[in-house]
Amino acid sequence: MTAGGGGDGENLVDWVLSAYELDTGISQDALIVLGPFMQTDLQESFLRRIDNLKNVEAITFDSHIEHLIQHASGVVAMGGYNTFCEILSFDKPGLVVPRTKPRLEQFIRACRAQELGLLSCLQGDSIREPRAMATALRQLTQQPKPSEVVLPGLLDGLENINKLVANRLAKKRTVPLELVRKITS
């Protein structure tokens, strides 16, 4: 679980911890990345709670979080652009809890991705019921990976660029390319 930079991810961390505290039968181990910008007193409070949970660990920051994501069985995140792209590119089941303030960017992205079947989404602005999060965590590793969802062209950007360039280069020029302009007097 990643709270991004941590400056506004405390609600997500609290909700995930509340789910593990309520439902001790969640079998999936959790590594919570608090983020370097989370307030120290909040970090300490979360770490005390984590000390009481057998299958939850935490770190403040990892400069190579992509390695953690690569080895994860699923990712819980707020749904910022970078993390969203990592969920897709590393082909991980994702549970996104987007923020809606100060912008709707994460919310729009997460809702559309859920509609397409790429990940699941919980709305974090409503009442954060620990049971709802526990259920979502239990279901996380059962949901399809993004690559199992057939959406033609979703991650074909490089292939499409190659095709467009090849098509352009294959076209014959109707006007010859002049390297030297003739000067007439």
Show where each model-derived region lies.
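C-terminal amphipathic helix plus adjacent low-complexity
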Residues: R131-S185
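Short acidic active-site motifs
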Residues: L42, S63-H67, N82-T83, A132, ...
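A donor-sugar binding/catalytic signature common to diverse glycosyltransferases
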Residues: H64-I108
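Class I S-adenosyl-L-methionine
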Residues: Q43-D51, C111-E115, R138
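Donor-nucleotide binding loops and adjacent catalytic segments primarily
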Residues: M1-G74, S126
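Hydrophobic/aromatic beta-strand patches that form the interior of the parallel beta-sheet core
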Residues: L31, E57-I59, V76, L95, ...
